From Swiss-Prot:
One cellular-component annotation, GO: cytoplasm
Designated name of the protein: Phosphopantetheine adenylyltransferase
Gene: coaD
Enzyme class: transferase
Keywords recorded for this protein, A-Z: ATP-binding, Coenzyme A biosynthesis, Cytoplasm, Magnesium, Nucleotide-binding, Nucleotidyltransferase, Transferase
Taxonomy of the source species: Bacteria, Pseudomonadati, Pseudomonadota, Gammaproteobacteria, Alteromonadales
Family indicated by similarity: Belongs to the bacterial CoaD family.
Entry-linked Gene3D superfamilies: HUPs (3.40.50.620)
Length: 158
């Protein structure tokens, strides 16, 4: 049985969609590691440390969830964390092709690493970090898409 899973991402910022998937994963696995990718090529708005802190805040009520920043290959991070499952979110059919390729690449790099795909609740299916940042950038109210502390951080980091 798989007891340790990783939910990787940039989480710039963490959204209600991410939080929804984390809650679902926490019910399915004994321990969930949220792996926050440093990913400097994406030019994140928040530093790795800020993203870790925001995710720790959002997941503080989940005893079996741990938040860890990482750089390098995801499969190497999974080995370090002794995880055998990657949790990935699928918002729409358009996400599937990329996620399918990614799952096959990860399996090729580490044959004992499985990918599990979860879908968010319908009310979160359209939310993306990119859209949330865009709304915040133009002064829009993002409170319905992110945790209140994340909304506050976005407003001070525009």
């Amino acid at each position: 049985m798989h007891t340790r899973a990783i939910y990787p991402g940039t989480f710039d910022p963490v959204t209600n969609g991410h939080a929804d998937l984390i809650e679902r994963a926490a019910k399915l696995f004994k321990h969930v590691v949220i792996g926050i990718a440093a990913n400097p090529s994406k030019k994140p708005r928040f530093t790795l440390e800020e993203r870790v802190a925001l995710l720790q805040l959002v997941t503080s009520h989940l005893d079996n969830v741990e938040v860890v920043g990482f750089s390098g290959l995801l499969v190497d991070f999974a080995k370090e964390q002794k995880a055998s499952v990657l949790v990935r979110g699928l918002r729409a059919v358009s996400d599937f092709e990329y996620e399918f390729q990614l799952a096959n690449m990860n399996r090729r790099l580490s044959s004992d690493l499985e990918s599990v795909f979860l879908t968010p609740a319908e009310e979160n299916s359209f939310i993306s970090s990119t859209l949330v940042k865009e709304v915040a950038h133009h002064g829009g109210d993002v409170s319905q898409f992110v945790h209140p502390e994340v909304a506050k951080a976005l407003m001070t980091n525009v």
